[in-house]
Amino acid sequence: MESVTTTIQCMGIKDSCNKKKIFQGGKSKIIEFQVKYENSDEVLNFQTTQSAINKLISELKKEIYSINLPISNYSVTSSSALQDINLLCQCISSTPKIQRSLSFVNFIETENNLTVSSTFIFDFIKNSDISGVLLKTKNNNKRTKKERLCVIKYSRVLYYFSETGGGSSTDINSTEVKKKRCKGLKFLDDCKITEKGENYFQLKTSNNETYVFTTPTNDECDRWVTTINNCIDYITKSTYRVSGQVQGTVVKSRNLAAKDLNGKSDPFVIIKAEQQQHRTQTIYKSLNPQFNEAFHFDITKHQGYVYFFVWDEDKFKTADFMGEVAVPLSLLPPNGSEISLWLPLSPRNSKDKVSGDILIKIRYFFSPDQIEVSPTSIYGNSLEAIVKNRPEICKNQVPNILYQFIEFFEQHLNEEGLFRICGNSTEIKFIKNQVNTDTQITFNPSSVHAYAGAFKLFFRELPEPLFTFNQYDNLINLAKKSTELQPLIEIIKTFPICHLNVLKLLLPFFGKIAANSKSNLMNHSNLSIVFGPSFLRVKDESHVNLMEMILVNDIAKFVFENSQQILKSI
């Protein structure tokens, strides 16, 4: 890369919109550049600002000793603005040391990403169910009244955008829309229109929040209400059980918010679907990280989402939230074709500092599953129901199949990625049906990961999780303070006897897996990521609490690490 010569040329200076409300005007100036590389057909065209140019000048002076630049401070309003920027471009194009500098490389990457991202946002908004500028008021609080560009995507998600660069146009096809920044999203699942009047409608969400949206005209109000009602019908039709898998790759992010004092961040991504999650590696000191990390989950609910949460790692305090996106499974092609999605990161609330987008590659395989759970089924019934309805297939109030699974897995403790590598969805469905109908199953050693998938599925489909809904808040509150062993033991003692007996079976088994982590790569931390969300979950899963999601893993890890002391006490 060092031998490649970069030529940068100023293509002009033009007016742009400043940071005003959507309906207001106002102009500032931007500089347009074109970058070419020797021996390459790649050409970059991007726009930047006076402040970005001055930041580049400052960083070049810090990075390159005794550098001689033609200008020390750039003013885009100066009478010599075009001449000055051309002199700077000539200096950079004729100085290989500047072209190879980290400051210049980062400048090109950041400013080009910002321009590409703006174009992406324009296309993202344009290709939607409906969009328009509305006044949004939350819970009838006038202080929350904000003018937002509202967009419904995938017939499932309501996005709202504000501007980082303003404009005077409300036309969706206007280039001014490129200046928008995502300010939040709401899922239309379990939402309903509770009131409609002249030029306004009220939307009630699943967590009982109300939003009043005021439209410019009554006709537009009618279009919004009709579209939302159609979306609600679509969601209802998409609600059914499946046997499937979602696979994909978190490719990269761009233009992330700086969370550290050095102007960078240390981002990582947590991906979640149903009661499963995966954490990517951390990419240190980057606002444009390349992850290229694969994920896969088993799926039982077609109406669900795959969530992506971006965090900034911090060694001395809790990770900082950097944004979220959600992909509805019903959006994805039913034939398993892979699609690539650029999605804008969304904040949780107005206090979050969030910017940037994330690129995901994703594919979804599924087949419809049975709708109702038989009272005699092993999968989908509570532990108490299994013990009551099928006592002949239980031992110590534990389903015999769990003993059989564990006996089989203990013969494969050195299997790399046990419980982490995805099994074949068709095989998992076959195993599930076999368990539901036969008292004894024959295990195939060549399908270890399929049996591991069926084992995980049993705990995900429990109507009452192993650690119980009643103790969710107590366990989360304990973890928020700092997990202590004795209070944890006292909480565990309150579990129903069948839950305790299953835990007594699992903990020694997990200890054996962790003891062989050098070969199977499944230490206590990885086990907690796989099983924690299944063992401990909130009753209403329609809203994902990000901080609690991390605490769930911490609790599970603490239980696994202290299993010997816990077993002695229960």
Curated annotation (Swiss-Prot):
Domain Rho-GAP: 381-567
Keyword field: Calcium, Cytoplasm, GTPase activation, Metal-binding
Domain PH: 127-233
UniProt: Ca(2+) 1 binding residues: D260, D266, D312, D314
CDD domains recorded: C2, PH, RhoGAP
MF term (GO), any: GTPase activator activity
Domain C2: 224-343
SUPFAM superfamilies linked: C2 domain (Calcium/lipid-binding domain, CaLB), GTPase activation domain, GAP, PH domain-like
Highest taxon, organism lineage: Eukaryota
GO biological process, one term: small GTPase-mediated signal transduction
Subcellular location: Cytoplasm
Xref: PROSITE patterns: C2, PH_DOMAIN, RHOGAP
Major localization class: cytoplasm
CC cofactor: Ca(2+)
A GO cellular-component term linked to this record: cytoplasm
A family per Pfam: RhoGAP
Amino-acid positions noted as binding Ca(2+) 2 in the UniProt annotation, renumbered to this chain: D260, D312, D314, D320
Keyword Isomerase set for record: no
PANTHER family documented for this protein: RHO GTPASE-ACTIVATING PROTEIN GACEE (PTHR23176:SF130), RHO/RAC/CDC GTPASE-ACTIVATING PROTEIN (PTHR23176)
Function: Rho GTPase-activating protein involved in the signal transduction pathway.
The name this protein goes by in its record: Rho GTPase-activating protein gacEE
Phylogenetic classification of the source organism: Eukaryota, Amoebozoa, Evosea, Eumycetozoa, Dictyostelia
